[in-house]
Amino acid sequence: MLMLSIMATIIFIITIVVMMLATLLSKKTLLDREKCSPFECGFDPMNSSRLPFALRFFLIAIIFLIFDVEIALLLPMVMIIKTSNLMNWTMTSFFFIFILLIGLYHEWNQGALEWNN
């Protein structure tokens, strides 16, 4: 128990030292602040470097992430077909694909997949 306590203390001290070193080494000087401003061939910037982001791109990205995660969960199901009951595997696969199709239908119905709005 004493050994575990000593190891935990040493790990804690090493963590604190590394965090303090990272803080000291990552300090920005006044000269580095010029790097944060946009640079356009030596001229002052005409427009802001931050452009507004269309909400349509954000919605498409969120829909892509949701369906991408669902597909990533669906792919390993092919590997477990050998070890599981065929009826259970079939019902689970159909249920999962059915949920995917319901989500796709809902997004299509809401008009989230139409770009010309």
Swiss-Prot record:
It catalyses: a ubiquinone + NADH + 5 H(+)(in) = a ubiquinol + NAD(+) + 4 H(+)(out). Coiled coil: none annotated. It comes from the Eukaryota. The chain crosses the membrane at residues 1-21, 57-77, 86-106. It comes from Anopheles quadrimaculatus. Its EC number is 7.1.1.2. This is NADH-ubiquinone oxidoreductase chain 3. One of its GO terms (cellular component) is NADH dehydrogenase complex. The keyword DNA-binding does not apply. One of its GO terms (molecular function) is NADH dehydrogenase (ubiquinone) activity.
